[in-house]
């Protein structure tokens, strides 16, 4: 399990052709390539949260099935540092490294040589997070900070896989709450695919850490949940009718604690339990209003965490027509392990593609996009990419990035038609797409920025701020996107089935079933220049009749 972090390539070359030649080798924008490994072996995942550092030690058998050998945890409050002051103190960095080092020693005692150290909300939001990574590196440890979009995607996929056996219909129409002490992820699932995802700074201990108990953190949490209007956004994205019932899926350590108070113990990641609605409602009411009192001896921090978790669940439980509440046993460590196993067993396969497309379509509807046009462009860009892929190098997940850019390239028209490409870039830069890394997100936004007539220039901050690898990716994606957009000028149908491609020599023949090609030829002449510069191919439009 490789924990190395690839250093970003920096630098810029203004000339498009030179930039493409310099970076002609295969590009990889994933979290990191995995070493080839063969089970059985022991491995571990160390998770640095806002309040606790946890380690799970697993053994993978020859069939890649995981058995948990040991779990360790130590309380360590990073949230008070980050959410109150914005950084992690030097003293706490040293303590954290020592604690993680002890966990690594424990993994090695089992004979494990592959392990992964990940950090979530608190370290992710610290302005000195790069210093934390550097200090870990100096100690011989490699720390990976999970971006919010990565964390939610891994957890969602792992929960979906775990529920597929025991609660198969739970994620047909559902709202999933991934609760941590530092952050809250809200996911909307419609017809079995994710269509909404939002990270909220509403973790169960966040207001306690930021304000202190004297500032009534529970009331602050209630106000924030109401002000976010997340229920309305969920309804819009899910196209949910007013009284259509949903499953409420609660995930995370606070959720498992609430389930345990109902007598439901979740020992394994694959476990899940359906909670009795009346009993669970009474439990969260007691936690919410009595701060955990009456449940025996309980640590004040744990009581505060349970109260906040109850407030969060109550907000969604009262606002949605919940037919059931389900709590799976999945953890961040289990989700990270499952993702790594999948990458090793099925490299290049992305099970999240359908969900990302659904999220993009929901965002497009929010900004009144032309769904037929977006689908046409997505279909055409995919055909062009597949035709070019054997002959040119592309970033990992190019098909995924092209699909996202195709669906969202015109959302800026919601603001202004004339400069919609710039507004599309701005809107995308302020939207977080699950399943994409920060680098991939920048690539998609910049490709959308240049889907119109203007070419990328170093004078454009949105282009000059990219790394050299990212610039090449943007050029290739934008070049394909412009051609696909031009081809849709006269397509009357919501699919690009009439488009056929033929690559002969240095000419890419675009064959369409249209009698009048004049409008399409003009559009292609205006927008096809970048494609010819980037790929060195002439575009030739012809009638297929």
Predicted feature locations:
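Ser/Thr-glycine-rich phosphate-binding loops at phosphate-binding pockets of nucleotides
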Residues: 50-52, 159, 179-187, 253
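A structural preference for short, hydrophobic beta-strand core positions in alpha/beta folds
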Residues: 117, 145, 327, 541-543
């Amino acid at each position: 399990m490789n924990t190395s972090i690839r250093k970003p390539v920096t630098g810029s070359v203004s000339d498009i052709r030179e930039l493409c030649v310099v970076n002609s080798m295969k590009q990889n924008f994933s979290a990191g390539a995995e070493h080839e490994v063969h089970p059985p072996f022991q491995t571990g995942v160390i998770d640095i949260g806002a309040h606790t550092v946890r380690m799970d030690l697993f053994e993978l058998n020859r069939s890649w099935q995981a058995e948990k050998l040991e779990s360790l945890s130590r309380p360590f409050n990073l949230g008070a540092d980050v959410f109150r002051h914005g950084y992690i103190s030097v003293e706490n960095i040293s303590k954290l490294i020592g604690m993680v080092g002890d966990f690594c020693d424990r993994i090695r005692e089992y004979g494990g040589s592959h392990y992964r150290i990940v950090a979530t909300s608190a370290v992710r939001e610290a302005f000195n997070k790069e210093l934390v990574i550097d200090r870990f590196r100096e100690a011989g440890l490699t720390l990976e900070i999970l971006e919010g979009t990565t964390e939610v995607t891994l957890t969602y996929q792992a929960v979906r896989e775990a529920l597929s056996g025991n609660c198969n219909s739970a994620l047909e129409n559902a709202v999933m709450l991934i609760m941590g002490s530092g952050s809250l992820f809200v996911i909307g699932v419609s017809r079995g695919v994710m269509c909404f995802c939002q990270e909220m700074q509403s973790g169960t201990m966040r207001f306690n850490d930021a304000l202190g108990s004297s500032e009534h953190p529970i009331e602050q949490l209630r106000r924030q949940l109401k002000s976010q209007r997340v229920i309305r956004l969920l309804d819009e994205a899910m196209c949910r009718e007013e009284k259509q019932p949903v499953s409420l899926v609660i995930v995370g350590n606070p959720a498992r604690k609430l389930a345990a108070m109902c007598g439901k113990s979740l020992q394994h990641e694959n476990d899940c339990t359906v909670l009795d609605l009346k009993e669970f409602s009474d439990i969260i009411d007691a936690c919410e209003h009595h701060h955990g009192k009456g449940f025996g001896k309980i640590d004040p921090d744990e009581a505060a965490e349970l109260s906040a978790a109850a407030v969060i669940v109550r907000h969604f439980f009262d606002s949605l027509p919940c037919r059931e509440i389900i709590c799976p046993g999945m953890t961040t460590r289990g989700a990270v392990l499952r993702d790594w196993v999948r990458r090793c067993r099925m490299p290049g396969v992305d099970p999240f593609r359908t969900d990302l497309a659904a999220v993009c379509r929901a965002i497009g509807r929010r900004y009144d996009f032309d769904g037929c046009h977006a689908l046409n462009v997505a279909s055409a860009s995919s055909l062009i990419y597949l035709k070019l892929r054997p002959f040119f190098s592309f970033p990992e997940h190019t098909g995924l990035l092209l699909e996202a850019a195709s669906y969202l390239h015109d959302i800026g028209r919601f603001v202004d038609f004339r400069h919609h490409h710039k507004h599309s870039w701005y809107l995308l830069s302020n939207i977080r797409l699950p399943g994409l890394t920060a680098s991939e997100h920048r690539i998609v936004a910049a490709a959308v920025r240049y889907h119109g007539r203007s070419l990328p220039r170093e004078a454009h901050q949105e282009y000059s701020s990219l790394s050299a690898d990212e610039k090449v990716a943007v050029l290739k994606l934008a070049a394909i996107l412009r051609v696909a957009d031009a081809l849709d000028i006269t397509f009357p149908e919501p699919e690009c089935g009439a488009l056929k491609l033929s690559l002969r020599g240095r000419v890419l023949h675009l064959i369409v079933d249209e009698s009048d090609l004049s409008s399409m030829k003009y559009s292609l002449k205006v927008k096809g220049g970048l494609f010819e510069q980037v790929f060195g191919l002439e575009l030739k439009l012809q009638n297929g009749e």
